[in-house]
From Swiss-Prot:
Gene Ontology process terms (BP): riboflavin biosynthetic process
Marked site: Essential for catalytic activity: 136, 174
Signal peptide coordinates: none
Binding-site residues for Mg(2+) 2, renumbered to this chain: 38, 153
PANTHER family associated with the record: 3,4-DIHYDROXY-2-BUTANONE 4-PHOSPHATE SYNTHASE, GTP CYCLOHYDROLASE II-RELATED
Keyword Lyase among UniProt keywords: yes
Protein name as it appears in the record: 3,4-dihydroxy-2-butanone 4-phosphate synthase
Record keywords: Lyase, Magnesium, Manganese, Metal-binding, Riboflavin biosynthesis
Length: 217
């Protein structure tokens, strides 16, 4: 990642801390990966605190594929099969079958309905029958170990919301430009500033976690 673009947002560690503060305050975070990976920015929110207004913003400015990042334990609890047995996507993104709340939704596609689905999936004691399949929310299974195992937006989301003190569940969606193309770092940074989001890179988070684990050992 071009550090010149990020220098005004502090050091890598400061950017992670700002991201955690943003989540604790109920705000979103823009998570950037490297130019030689997906080269995109994802809007992420803690699943516990995401509002209908934030979901609407995500749908309006994102790819439309709103994803709910979950741990393997939660995936098993909800009995969500993986979308395919043999994942041949470039980065092995862990899509499960799509979901919809079994109660409290209409078509399932509105911002309010998608928030209802997210809340149903992360509720304490949630069970498979609380969700219908397919639906308009795309669960993603994070790899154990987070970004230290796989440097993806899914793992970054789980790591960030967990470090911020929330349940290990977060919502993400890729930012797109008005013409439908994928937003790159300059556009992502501008959008984040306009919408009071913190900005962090996956590289920042990897360094942060490694340093904290080194100090803990």
């Amino acid at each position: 990642m071009n550090q010149t673009l990020l220098s005004s947002f502090g050091t890598a560690f400061e950017r992670v801390e700002h991201a955690l503060d943003a989540l604790r305050e109920g705000r979103g975070v823009m998570v950037l990966d490297d130019e030689d990976r997906e080269n995109e920015g994802d809007m992420i929110f803690a699943a516990e605190t995401m509002t209908v207004e934030q979901m609407a913003l995500t749908i309006r400015h994102g790819s439309g594929i709103v994803c709910l990042c979950l741990t393997e334990d939660r995936r098993k609890q909800l009995d969500l099969p993986m979308m395919v047995e043999n994942n041949t996507s470039a980065y092995g993104t862990g899509f499960t079958v799509t979901i919809e709340a079994a109660e409290g939704v209409t078509t399932g596609v509105s911002a309010a309905d998608r928030v209802t689905t997210v809340r149903a999936a992360i509720a304490d004691g949630a069970k498979p029958s609380d969700l219908n399949r397919p639906g308009h929310v795309f669960p993603l299974r994070a790899q154990p170990g987070g970004v230290l195992t796989r440097g993806g937006h899914t793992e970054a989301t789980i790591d960030l919301v967990t470090l911020a003190g929330f349940k290990p569940a977060g919502v993400l969606c890729e930012l797109t430009n008005d013409d439908g193309t994928m937003a790159r770092a300059p556009e992502c940074i501008k959008f984040a500033q306009q919408h009071n989001m913190a900005i962090v890179t996956i590289e920042d988070l990897v360094a942060y976690r490694r340093e904290h684990e080194r100090k803990a050992s």
